[in-house]
Amino acid sequence: MGDFLNLFTEDVVEVFLWTDESFPVYFEYELSPLDYELPIIIPNYNGKFYGWQPWHYEGDRRTRHATSTLGGEKLSGGIVSGWRAEFFIPYKLLVPLNQVPPVSGTKWRVNMYRIDYDNATTHFAWQKISKSFHEYNNFGTFIFE
């Protein structure tokens, strides 16, 4: 596994940022326990997904991220009791989307997920979904002040 691969097939944390409800395109960020990342923009037309990776993903357009494990080594397939992730997504990376950067009063639709494949697959979501993480109409709302 590595950066820009199908991280969602393993343990991962994800955030979805839908910055403009009038346009079905949103940003998805995934981070694995091994600190691999997948930043993509998703045009979602009636459940058909077309992921686009960032171009010129460097400098102040690049995310910053880190992970750590609890109770074991940070290894692929390693036995751990848990893991932590932190990341910073710069507005400059989101510039192709509308309402970026946000101003006071701006509303973005957002959802966050954690997928755990250790034993039985377990999904955790900030806002409930029925079938797919890409149900952007079910995302919660961030209001910027």
What are these regions (language model features)?
Residues 1-145:
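Structural preference for beta-rich elements and adjacent junctions enriched in aromatics
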